[in-house]
């Protein structure tokens, strides 16, 4: 995997900054709830990727 794969796109950087600004003045309780929701979404994303990889046909490269 290329090191650039771990960089954010311009759009992702913009969205990240927008989230930082939007969450700057929330309570600790709200921040914890957002963290729990984000963790759940990351787990779902992992499950979807794993399922898609299982469904993908394996073909030789070249």
From Swiss-Prot:
Database matches in Pfam families: NblA
Q: Which domain of life is it from?
A: Bacteria
Similarity-based family: To Synechococcus PCC 7942 NblA and some, to chloroplast ycf18.
Recorded protein name is: Phycobilisome degradation protein NblA homolog 1
Source organism of the structure: Synechocystis sp. (strain ATCC 27184 / PCC 6803 / Kazusa)
